C-alpha cells in the first residue's frame, strides 16, 4: 500500500442518534468509509413509516472537505467524560478515525443549545454539537442531491 493509500485508509466517520420509544427503535445513522462510501439510514415507525437506507460514493474532494470540517471543529482534542450520559430520551454516538487518532463519543440527545451551555463541559459539548450540525447538513445535502437529480 502506498503512503497516499495508507493515509486514505486511515479515515472513517460514523454518527448515530436514536431512541427506543412508543414507535420502536427510531434512529438516524450515517458513515463515511475510506473508499468514499457514504451509508445513510433513517428509521422511524411513526405512521408505519419504513426504514430509509441510501448508499452513495463521494469524491475525494468531498472527503477532503469532510476532513477540513473535522479539523476546524477541533473535536479530536475533546473528551466526553463530563458530557451527559445517554438516557431514555436518547443517545448520540460519534466515531472518527483520522490521522492515526481514533475517538468515540457517546452522549445523550441534545435538544437545544441551552442544554450544551448548562452542561459540565460546555466548550467540549459545543464543539460536538456544531460538528454534528455541520455533518448532518452535509449528509442531507449529499443524499438529497444524489438521489433527486435526474440524468439527462
Curated annotation (Swiss-Prot):
Keywords associated with the record: Developmental protein, Differentiation, mRNA processing, mRNA splicing, mRNA transport, Nucleus, Oogenesis, Transport
Disruption phenotype: RNAi-mediated knockdown results in embryonic lethality due to developmental arrest during morphogenesis. RNAi-mediated knockdown in the syncytial gonads of adult hermaphrodites results in some inviable embryos and then eventually no egg laying.
Subcellular location: Nucleus
Name of the protein described by the UniProt record: Protein mago nashi homolog
Tissue expression summary: Expressed in the soma and germline of hermaphrodites.
Known function: Core component of the splicing-dependent multiprotein exon junction complex (EJC) deposited at splice junctions on mRNAs. Positively regulates the nuclear export of spliced mRNAs including the sex determination gene tra-2. Promotes oogenesis and represses germline masculinization and spermatogenesis. Required for embryonic development, possibly through positively regulating the expression of pie-1. Not required for the spatial patterning of pie-1 in embryos.
Disulfide bonds: none
